[in-house]
Every structure is written in structure tokens, then in C-alpha cells.
């Protein structure tokens, strides 16, 4: 049910820090901070049962003051389980169970309990009395290259009132506090692949140099003619600029310059006239 997590998000208080040290290893879960939910629905003829668990990796949950207190977990609950039931001929699920797990300002983490030996990650476990029953839950944050979000492992009625949530995420990997981890290499690329900018290569393309040479050549031509007109003829103002006859020669000068530059790069040795 989305209404439960929306209520917790509305009153969520950010933890002062989402960094934890377990067995002298540092972890930073801030990338997945904030209330998250996971749910499942099972058939319990003639009804249906829906279970939802809300948790925040960085802080405890706060009540929504706009909702009745008995319809939500108490303040500072670490994981809140909510059970709903859909009766025959009814359209909407009705809240039937409120199961708080843990209490405190933030989760208390231990080394990862699941997965192969050496797998990076964290675990948090809680057991609470619930009516005449006792509830237990394990939440495992498992180091992974891919974010998968929280998932319930024992979907069902809860064997012996035990629930387990596994969350595979890059945030659960050990944080050494130094340089960031290298990005995952794309298939078919070598470590030296990439463009000039990513490799720090300051070289420019020959087309850029050609453009710069042309601009400088035109500027020198105009300034040179202006100086000649001023020094030789005493012209001023607009008369300093090259005359119309000179301007008509500019395209041909540029064409010849481009031809020479291209010939230099291509190594062309062709001479003579071109066919008309």
C-alpha cells in the first residue's frame, strides 16, 4: 500500500549521518536513505492478505500525526510491518495488523549474515513481542554492482513469525573513504578507449587550425591594406579599408590558401590545369 510509505515520507527526519562502522569497515548508506517499502499479497481463501514493510536504512520511522496512532507503528520504529486483509465481495483492503520491529534513533548494524563468505554488506535484526506471539526480522544490505531495491525472501504467512528482507545495492559496499570506485567497464572497450577530452589530450583537429589560419590571414590582409592606405594616401575612416578591387580578390586568395593547406596535408603533387 503506497499510503503507508507516503505518510512516513511526509514526516521523515534525515539522519545526522548515514555512515556506519562495522568490524572496522566503513559503510555509507546515504544513497538509499529515506523510507522505502516492500510488499506482497497472498491468497488466504476466502480472503486475501497483503503484507507491507516500511524501513529507512539511515533512521527510525516517525508517525504521521494526521493518521490514528493505532493504525501505524510507534515513533522510532526501525521496521514497520503492516498487514491488510481483503474480504470477499469487498473492494478495498482493510488494515488488520501493525507489527513494529526495533526501536531507537537509527538501525544498529552487524556484519552481513547471509551470502557466501567474504560478501560485503550489513545486517540488522530485531525481535519484538506482538500480542501473544513473538516477531523476528532480518534485514540484509548486500554489496552489489546493481541497485535492486528491497525484496522479501520468505514470501508467505511468515514461517514462525520470521521475516527476511534482502537489499542488493552498491551502497552496501565497503567505503574506504578515498577515491571513488572505478565505473563498470563497458563490453568491447579497453581502459585507453575514449575521446580526447576524457584522456586529457589537448591537441586540436587540423580543421580548427585551418579555420584559425584563414581568420588570421584575412585580419592581416585588412590591417595591412588599411595601413598602406593611411601611410601612402593619407586616407581615414572607411577609406582605410581595402577597395572593392582588393575585396574581389579575397575569395580567390582564400581558395588558393585552402588548396595549398589541403595539398600539404594530402601530399598531392598534381600540377597543370583542371578540366573545364
Curated annotation (Swiss-Prot):
Residue span, MRH domain: 16-175
GO cellular component: cytoplasmic vesicle membrane; Golgi membrane; mitochondrial membrane; phagophore assembly site membrane
Taxonomic superkingdom: Eukaryota
Region Disordered, residue ranges: 174-198
Transmembrane domains' residue ranges: 204-224
Annotated function: Effector of VPS34 phosphatidylinositol 3-phosphate kinase signaling. Regulates the cytoplasm to vacuole transport (Cvt) vesicle formation. Plays a role in ATG protein retrieval from the pre-autophagosomal structure (PAS) and is especially required for autophagy-dependent cycling of ATG9.
Family: Belongs to the ATG27 family.
Listed name of the protein: Autophagy-related protein 27
Origin species: Yarrowia lipolytica (strain CLIB 122 / E 150)
Amino acid at each position: 500500500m503506497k499510503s503507508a510509505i507516503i505518510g512516513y515520507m511526509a514526516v521523515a527526519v534525515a539522519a545526522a549521518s548515514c555512515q556506519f562502522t562495522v568490524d572496522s569497515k566503513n559503510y555509507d548508506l546515504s544513497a538509499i536513505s529515506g523510507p522505502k517499502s516492500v510488499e506482497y499479497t497472498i491468497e488466504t481463501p476466502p480472503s486475501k492478505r497483503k503484507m507491507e514493510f516500511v524501513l529507512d536504512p539511515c533512521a527510525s520511522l516517525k508517525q504521521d500525526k494526521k493518521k490514528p496512532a493505532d493504525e501505524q507503528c510507534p515513533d522510532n520504529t526501525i521496521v514497520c510491518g503492516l498487514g491488510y486483509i481483503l474480504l470477499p465481495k469487498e473492494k478495498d483492503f482493510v488494515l488488520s495488523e501493525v507489527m513494529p520491529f526495533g526501536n531507537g534513533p537509527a538501525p544498529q548494524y552487524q556484519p552481513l549474515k547471509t551470502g557466501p563468505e567474504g560478501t560485503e554488506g550489513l545486517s540488522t535484526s530485531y525481535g519484538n513481542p506482538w500480542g501473544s506471539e513473538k516477531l523476528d526480522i532480518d534485514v540484509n544490505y548486500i554489496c552489489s554492482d546493481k541497485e535492486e531495491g528491497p525484496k522479501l525472501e520468505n514470501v508467505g504467512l511468515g514461517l514462525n513469525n520470521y521475516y527476511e528482507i534482502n537489499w542488493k545495492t552498491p551502497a552496501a559496499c565497503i567505503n574506504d573513504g578515498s577515491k571513488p570506485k572505478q565505473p563498470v567497464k563497458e563490453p568491447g572497450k579497453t581502459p585507453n578507449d575514449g575521446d580526447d577530452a576524457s584522456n586529457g589530450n589537448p591537441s586540436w583537429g587540423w580543421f580548427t587550425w585551418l579555420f584559425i589560419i584563414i581568420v588570421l590571414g584575412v585580419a592581416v590582409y585588412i590591417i595591412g591594406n588599411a595601413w598602406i592606405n593611411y601611410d601612402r594616401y593619407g586616407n581615414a575612416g572607411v577609406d582605410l579599408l581595402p577597395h572593392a578591387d582588393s575585396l574581389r580578390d579575397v575569395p580567390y586568395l582564400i581558395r588558393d590558401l585552402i588548396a595549398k593547406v589541403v595539398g600539404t596535408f594530402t601530399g598531392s603533387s598534381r600540377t597543370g590545369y583542371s578540366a573545364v
